[in-house]
Amino acid sequence: MVNQRSNIMKTLNRLNYCLRLLFISIAFFCFKTSRASNFNAPKDTVNQTNKFKLKTVIVDAGHGGFRTGASGKYSVEKNVTLQIAFKLQKAIEKELSDVKVVMTRTTDDDILWQKRSDIANDAKGDIFISIHCNSLPDRIVRSASGKKTRVANRSGKGVLLLVYGFHRTKEEEKAIKDTRLSDEEEMDAVIDPNDPAAMILMNEYKRKYRKQSVRFASILNQEFIENDGRRSEGIREQGVLVLCHSAMPAVLVETGYINNPDEEDYLNSEEGQNQIVATIVRALKTLKTEVEA
């Protein structure tokens, strides 16, 4: 009998607890609904982020100056990326005549990553393309006696595409706030970043930029594989500062392994550079057609 009463009391306590949770949930929902209906969101707040035209492309030649980047037998990354960037600029201006190209680097100077992002954000770029060359670190080989020897690893081959990692979204939010939310030409009024409307707009920008970054990387990856017959290591997330601080869709293109002799020859050849450029332009055309449809 005592056990039966104990079980009944436990059941009643659980029921009481569930009812209290239900009441709190309903009250919270009503509060959020009331609050959401009371703030004055700017006209077509979310729709503003969906108005996308590919008008300005930012071309970023990786490294420069004393930051030479990866190196091969006879060439260094900073020179190869600048050569490809110049070719890409000319190709875009020729084949996409209504698109403006902004270069983050045109000389052999060391441009800090924040300056590159500032150039891109000041130009109100619609997409950021950073050109790089990949490389593998030396392997450590241990002999039978225990002696360690560094051996060059020349086995790397193919392209790799990087988009910003989710762990750096706070930095992206700051770039969007400074570049997009403060732009009175895009908004009916300057929005307080703490306002719920600004939060909605911020999330919509982040969603759009993320989606378009991954989409452009996917198109580009497919072009490299199917049209150029190149090996690809796919698309990866990485906390690259220049990508996270650019308030726009952004992709870093590792065009090949410069410390692989065959890849180094390809990256330094006119044929190889022209093929890389043509692939990027095709991907841009596809993206432009999709987003402006």
Language model region names:
Residues 1-39:
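Bacterial Sec-dependent N-terminal signal peptides
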Residues 30, 68-69, 263-264:
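A generic structural signal for short coil/turn motifs at secondary-structure boundaries
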Residues 39-49, 79-293:
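Active-site-proximal helix/loop segments of hydrolytic enzymes
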Residues 55-74:
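Short glycine-rich His-centered loop
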